[in-house]
């Protein structure tokens, strides 16, 4: 930690009157630079990083998730990375439980937690809380899966739209797991998933003094360029070999949450002979762009975000140092 930031750290960490413990939420679209800023905050402030990423929880999925490298993790450890095998499920409720425990652990050490990632549903559930919607029923799930094999997931998505249009509007017609879960909840309870979510509880928004920062480019075209460049870099780094190792295990399939992760689904189809290499690349980039679009939709409705742009008003790229200084300056204002 730089000595010049010690005073800032002391102000951020020290209790002051009725002020709640500080927690930093660092969000943004994919490929925007969240990891770099999180590592910088660790170096500058001694903050502890908690990953908020539904794909990085899986072991042996490193390149395609843009997981921090071994050297980066040695420099700035990330919690909630590599905690599940790709064959295992990891729910939103699992994340909320684990993240709450990590935040408490970090505060007990007198440090500041930085929750960094792009899985917006995780952030929303952690801050606003989870509802007590019914647990999964294997028999009901099996019935839905049987119908899907006969009718196709788009048909079941249309059915979901007829009973719960709000939930269906936020789910892609081919996102089997989410369609299945939403229909399952409706069949079991007779109540829409959107109605259950309206009864959320146990959120942390009022438990901590949240500093909520979004790092993003001013222009979407820059993000699209970075997405394409990063996907090509992943391919050069051996992404296909990484997915091939998962494919050859024979205990994973394309309907599992791990393999549905952006990029992995497209590479899986390539290895299965469903698409060509060029088609895989195009679809992988397109899927990542769609992910960024969905993330921006969440972010635009997020109240209380401090936007830190990676470009100036003339669309020129800012240096890493300039971006970090923007974040530190905003944090300093919060202590006044």
UniProtKB/Swiss-Prot annotation:
Top-rank taxon of the source lineage equals: Bacteria
Regarding protein family, the annotation reads: Belongs to the IPP transferase family.
Arranged from A to Z, the UniProt key words for this protein are:
ATP-binding, Magnesium, Nucleotide-binding, Transferase, tRNA processing
Which residues are listed for ATP binding in this entry? 28-35
Q: What is said about its interaction partners and assembly?
A: Monomer.
Catalytic activity field = adenosine(37) in tRNA + dimethylallyl diphosphate = N(6)-dimethylallyladenosine(37) in tRNA + diphosphate
Required cofactor(s): Mg(2+)
Q: Give the record's GO biological process terms.
A: tRNA modification
For the ligand (substrate), the binding residues are 30-35
Which EC number applies? 2.5.1.75
Where along the sequence does the record put site: Interaction with substrate tRNA?
Answer: 119, 141
This one is known as tRNA dimethylallyltransferase
Give this protein's Gene Ontology molecular function annotations: ATP binding; tRNA dimethylallyltransferase activity
Q: Where is this region: Interaction with substrate tRNA?
A: 53-56
Q: What class of enzyme is it?
A: transferase
Q: Is Transmembrane there in the keyword field?
A: no
Q: Where are the transmembrane segments?
A: none
* Purpose: Catalyzes the transfer of a dimethylallyl group onto the adenine at position 37 in tRNAs that read codons beginning with uridine, leading to the formation of N6-(dimethylallyl)adenosine (i(6)A).
GN (gene name) = miaA
């Amino acid at each position: 930690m730089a000595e010049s930031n010690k005073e800032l750290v002391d102000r951020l960490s020290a209790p002051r009157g009725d002020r709640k413990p500080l927690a930093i939420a660092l969000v943004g679209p994919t490929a925007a630079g969240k990891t770099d800023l999180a590592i910088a905050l660790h170096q500058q402030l001694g903050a502890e990083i908690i990953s908020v990423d539904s794909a990085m929880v899986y072991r042996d999925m490193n390149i395609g998730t843009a997981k921090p490298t071994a050297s980066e993790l040695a420099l700035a450890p990330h919690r909630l990375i590599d905690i599940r095998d790709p064959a295992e499920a990891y729910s939103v409720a699992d994340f909320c439980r684990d993240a709450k425990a990590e935040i408490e652990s970090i505060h007990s050490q007198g440090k500041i937690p930085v929750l960094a990632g792009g899985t917006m549903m995780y952030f929303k559930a952690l801050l606003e809380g989870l509802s007590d919607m019914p647990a999964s029923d294997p028999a009901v799930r099996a019935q839905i899966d049987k119908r899907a094999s006969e009718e196709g997931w788009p048909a079941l998505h249309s059915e979901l739209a007829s009973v719960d249009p709000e939930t269906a509007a936020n789910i892609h017609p081919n996102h089997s797991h989410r369609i299945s879960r939403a229909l399952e909840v409706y069949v079991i309870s007779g109540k829409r998933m959107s109605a259950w979510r309206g009864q959320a509880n146990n959120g942390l928004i009022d438990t901590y003094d949240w500093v909520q920062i979004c790092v993003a480019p001013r222009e979407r075209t820059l993000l699209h360029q970075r997405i394409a460049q990063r996907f090509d870099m992943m391919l050069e780094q051996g992404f296909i070999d990484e997915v091939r190792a998962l494919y050859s295990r024979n205990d994973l399939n394309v309907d599992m949450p791990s393999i549905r992760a952006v990029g992995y689904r497209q590479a899986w189809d390539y290895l299965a002979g469903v698409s060509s290499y060029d088609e895989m690349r195009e679809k992988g980039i397109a899927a990542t762009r769609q992910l960024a679009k969905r993330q921006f939709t969440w972010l635009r409705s997020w109240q209380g975000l401090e936007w830190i742009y990676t470009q100036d008003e003339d669309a020129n790229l800012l240096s890493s140092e300039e971006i970090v200084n923007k974040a530190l300056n905003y944090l300093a204002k919060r202590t006044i």
